[in-house]
């Protein structure tokens, strides 16, 4: 798989001024080059850093920020003030900057050279001074950004920059993201609906409707030989009963049908340039022509693993969010998935929620090799034996997130969770995870419900709330974080204060 981050870069712009003379200008440039080389050579950053020079005037700032806006490879800008850099010279550039901004408050030298420091050294190395000036103008202008404080070689500093870079990549990816809705949302469901125009304006992605009949035109054109080849891939990649390979059985035919559905979905998604899709079990094509005999669950599982966003029952917000999660998660070890809250297990301190769906859970979170099975699925317009991958998730900590439309804004809801080992489910042959929402089921689920959270969410073992805080900052949307320290009383107050803030903030902007 190609590294999704290789197509991107982050620009590094140093702030200074000409007051301190030519030697200072040369030193600032040399230090900046060394720092950028060090950042790239650290092996800790997923995106290449490109030094774009030192800005000593308003025109230079404006020029580099305009260039950043117009370069598709640039997904964000890091600024650092080596010397004092009068902030009025940053105003016009900041007014025009459209890319995510990280303000790095660091210093070329780690420690003060107590015995040798003179006025020349202090004038040259005054990030403590310059970064406060820059920070003031950003705050005065209401510029959303991430501020990272720490020595540029230290692990924690590099980690915070890396988190922001991953979010920037996910954000850049969403700016030309197309989500295809095969059929509409599930009838009468509120939380999966929302304002698609506002979503595109705020988060970048575009949502289109595609009738199932159009998908079926691709389905008709799939060649049997290609289906046979994909079925062979299934049998090679997944555990399964040997009897499943018997071509005379209904079970084999259902696997074959699932492979044909996957090829049809791949073909239409590629043709349309889509990065994600939704399905609806009540819209699977007409019975008088080519049609799916049940929802394309196995196809959805496999496409999610490759990075396609997915949302069940027409949930386009989850489809877009999952694609972003997948991009941010690339190169991290434990995986991510679309999930749905299904069933509660009240068990004292271990009270938990079974996460599953009818079929569509991503195998990236599987604890062991997924097993290909065929079982009856009795929901939707067609009730049929249906192929799917069956597995349980890894155990360990993770973070799940969802976006809901509050009418006057989007709210990102994030919950830290602990995935635990489930008991066997011999009568429920689906993929699943079992987790305890932090701080416990009573508070975690209660806070999620108070926030208006969905029954669908996008989960990752590797992403933390820090990623989502950066995402919400870039998008300019509300975020609430349910964690080990959450109490219902304080959470209610936060929601009420946020309500007032976003009303007033929208009026002021």
From Swiss-Prot:
Required cofactor(s): Mn(2+)
Keywords: Arabinose catabolism, Carbohydrate metabolism, Isomerase, Manganese, Metal-binding
Pfam families with a match to the protein in the record: AraA_central, AraA_N, Arabinose_Iso_C
Pathway: Carbohydrate degradation; L-arabinose degradation via L-ribulose; D-xylulose 5-phosphate from L-arabinose (bacterial route): step 1/3
Swiss-Prot/TrEMBL catalytic activity: beta-L-arabinopyranose = L-ribulose
Residues holding Mn(2+): 313, 340, 357, 456
Top-level taxon of origin: Bacteria
Family: Belongs to the arabinose isomerase family.
NCBIfam families for this protein: PRK02929.1
Known role: Catalyzes the conversion of L-arabinose to L-ribulose.
Full protein name: L-arabinose isomerase
Protein source organism: Bacteroides thetaiotaomicron (strain ATCC 29148 / DSM 2079 / JCM 5827 / CCUG 10774 / NCTC 10582 / VPI-5482 / E50)
Gene designation per UniProt: araA
């Amino acid at each position: 798989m190609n590294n999704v981050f290789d197509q991107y870069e982050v620009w590094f712009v140093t702030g200074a001024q000409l007051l301190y003379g030519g030697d200072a200008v040369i030193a600032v440039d040399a230090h900046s080059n060394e720092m950028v080389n060090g950042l790239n050579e650290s092996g800790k950053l997923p995106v290449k850093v490109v030094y774009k020079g030192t800005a000593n005037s308003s025109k230079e700032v404006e020029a580099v920020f305009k260039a950043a806006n117009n370069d598709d490879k640039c997904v964000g800008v890091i600024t650092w003030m080596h010397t004092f850099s009068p902030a009025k010279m940053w105003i016009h550039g900041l007014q025009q900057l459209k890319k995510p901004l990280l303000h790095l408050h660091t210093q070329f030298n780690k420690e003060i050279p107590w015995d040798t420091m003179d006025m020349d050294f202090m004038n040259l190395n005054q990030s403590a001074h310059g970064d406060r000036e820059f920070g003031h103008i950003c705050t005065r202008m209401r510029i959303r950004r991430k501020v990272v404080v720490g020595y540029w070689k230290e692990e924690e500093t590099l980690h915070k920059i890396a988190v922001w870079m991953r979010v920037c990549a996910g954000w850049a990816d969403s700016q030309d993201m197309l989500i295809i809705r095969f059929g509409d949302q599930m009838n009468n469901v509120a939380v999966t609906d929302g304002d698609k125009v506002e979503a595109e304006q705020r988060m970048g992605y575009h949502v289109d409707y595609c009738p199932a009949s159009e998908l079926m035109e691709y389905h008709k054109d799939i060649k049997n030989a290609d289906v046979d080849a994909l079925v062979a891939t299934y049998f090679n990649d997944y555990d399964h009963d040997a009897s499943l390979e018997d071509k005379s059985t209904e079970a084999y035919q259902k696997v074959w049908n699932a492979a044909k559905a996957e090829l049809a979905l791949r073909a239409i998604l590629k043709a349309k340039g889509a990065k994600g899709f939704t399905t609806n079990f009540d819209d699977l094509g007409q019975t008088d022509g080519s049609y799916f005999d049940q929802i394309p669950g196995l196809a959805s599982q496999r496409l999610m693993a490759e990075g396609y966003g997915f949302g069940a029952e027409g949930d386009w917000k989850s489809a877009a969010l999952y694609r972003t999660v997948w991009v941010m998660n690339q190169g991290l070890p434990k995986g991510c998935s679309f999930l749905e809250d299904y069933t509660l297990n009240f068990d004292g301190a271990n009270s938990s929620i079974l996460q599953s769906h009818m079929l569509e859970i991503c195998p990236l979170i599987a604890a062991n090799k997924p097993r290909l099975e065929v079982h009856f699925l009795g929901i939707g317009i067609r009730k049929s034996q249906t192929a799917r991958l069956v597995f349980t998730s890894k155990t360990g900590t993770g973070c799940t997130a969802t976006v809901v439309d509050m009418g006057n804004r989007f709210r990102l809801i994030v919950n830290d969770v602990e995935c635990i080992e489930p008991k066997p489910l011999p009568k429920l042959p689906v993929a699943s995870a079992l987790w305890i929402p932090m701080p416990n089921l009573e508070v975690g689920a209660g806070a999620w419900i108070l926030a208006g959270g969905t029954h669908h969410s996008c989960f990752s073992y590797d992403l933390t709330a820090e990623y989502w805080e950066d995402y919400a900052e870039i998008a300019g949307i509300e975020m609430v974080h349910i964690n080990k320290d959450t109490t219902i009383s304080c959470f209610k107050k936060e929601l009420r204060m946020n309500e007032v803030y976003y009303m007033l903030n929208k009026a002021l902007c």
